């Protein structure tokens, strides 16, 4: 699937605002992939499809999580996390993407995971720093991403955890595990 086909496919699933975000993530992911030695074509496709399920009804996502035996603890956390694993599932079935590297980059772009691949890190950080994002801490992560993808990832996860904690919201366990894995030098 080429860029134009992928963008046309995903555009049907997104609002105009989210589509603009997706194009920003795509361009940022390609840039990061080239900078840090990841496969830029895989980064392009993963970035295009990363929010494919973002606007699916919560009930549909819940059913997919249960039916496909995705980790049950997903349902105990913010539904904003669900679109990543559900998106990987739907992109495979509806868009025909079969590459596991791409599907994993989509699957873990909201939570991270210990043992993240370079491509997964690229998509996570690209989603966080794409040019249309404007929130406290994003410029610091952009600066880190110029030279050190791991430090950019660590800082983005720290920022996310602090944001959630300040709002007395739970942090998804996989995100804590990812942070610990990263700072332990793994």
Curated annotation (Swiss-Prot):
Its EC number is 3.6.1.41. InterPro entries: Diverse_Catalytic_Enzymes, HD/PDEase_dom, HD_domain, YqeK. Gene3D superfamilies: Hypothetical protein af1432. Fe cation binds at residues 21, 50-51, 127. Disruption phenotype: Mutant shows increased levels of Ap4G, Ap4U, Ap3A and Ap4A. Cells form pellicles that are initially flat and thin. The pellicles finally become thicker, their flat surfaces are broken by a number of broad pits, the inner surface of which are covered with fruiting bodies. The colonies also show a defect in gross morphology, in that their central region is flat ang glossy. GO terms for molecular function: hydrolase activity; metal ion binding; nucleotide binding. Residues 18-132 form the HD domain. Keywords: Hydrolase, Iron, Metal-binding, Nucleotide-binding. PROSITE patterns: HD. It comes from the Bacteria. The keyword Lipid metabolism does not apply. Belongs to the Ap4A hydrolase YqeK family. Homodimer. Hydrolyzes diadenosine 5',5'''-P1,P4-tetraphosphate (Ap4A) to yield ADP. PANTHER family: BIS(5'-NUCLEOSYL)-TETRAPHOSPHATASE, SYMMETRICAL, SLR1885 PROTEIN. This is Bis(5'-nucleosyl)-tetraphosphatase, symmetrical.
